Amino acid sequence: MTTIVSVRRNNQVVIAGDGQVSLGNTVMKGNARKVRRLYHNKVLAGFAGGTADAFTLFERFEAKLEMHQGHLMRAAVEMAKDWRSDKVLRKLEALLAVADAESSLIITGNGDVVQPENDLIAIGSGGAFAQSAATALLENTDLSALEIAEKSLTIAGDICVFTNQFKTIEELKY
C-alpha cells in the first residue's frame, strides 16, 4: 500500500506521499508519484490503494472538479455519489486525500466524504504512524505544514514495511 499525509497550518496546506508500489510482499516500484495537483493547481490530491484504481479515481475526480468549477466539497460529494452507484467504481480499492485553500477531505472506498478534525489526514498502510507523528508535531512544535508532513512521512517510512522514503510533496499557500 502506501502512506499519504496532509497537514494544514498557517495559511499552508500540504499533501505528501511515499513512492512504494507493492505487489503482495514484493516491492515493484519505489518512485511512484501518488500526489498531484489538480484543477489549475488549486487542489492537491493523494491516493492510497491500488495504483490503477487510483488513476481512475483521479481522472473522475478531476472531471468533477471541472464540472463544479473547482468547488472541492461539491466535487467530492458528487464523486462519492458516483462511487456508491457505479458498479465499476464500487470495486475500486483506493482512498483519496484532497485539499484546497479551504478544506481537507478524505474520499473513501465506501463513497464517504470525511472532513477530518484538525485538518490532518493520514491514510494508507502507514497512516496511523504518520497521523501520530503529525499530531505530536502539530501540538508541540512551530514547524511548518510542509516540515510536519515530511517528518511524519519519514517516521511512517521507518516503521511501515509498505512505505518507503521516496517522497512526493505538494504545497498550497493561501
Swiss-Prot record:
Active site: T2
Reactions accelerated catalytically: ATP-dependent cleavage of peptide bonds with broad specificity
Binding site residues for Na(+): G157, C160, T163
Native organism: Shewanella halifaxensis (strain HAW-EB4)
EC number(s) on file: 3.4.25.2
BP-aspect Gene Ontology terms: proteolysis involved in protein catabolic process
Matches recorded under NCBIfam families: ATP_dep_HslV, PRK05456.1
Keyword Zinc listed: no
HAMAP family linked to this entry: HslV
Protein name: ATP-dependent protease subunit HslV
GO cellular component assignments: HslUV protease complex; proteasome core complex
One Pfam family, short name: Proteasome
Family per similarity comment: Belongs to the peptidase T1B family. HslV subfamily.
PANTHER family cross-referenced by the UniProt entry: ATP-DEPENDENT PROTEASE SUBUNIT HSLV, METALLOPROTEASE TLDD
Localization per record: Cytoplasm
UniProt entry keywords in alphabetical sequence: Allosteric enzyme, Cytoplasm, Hydrolase, Metal-binding, Protease, Sodium, Threonine protease
Role played: Protease subunit of a proteasome-like degradation complex believed to be a general protein degrading machinery.
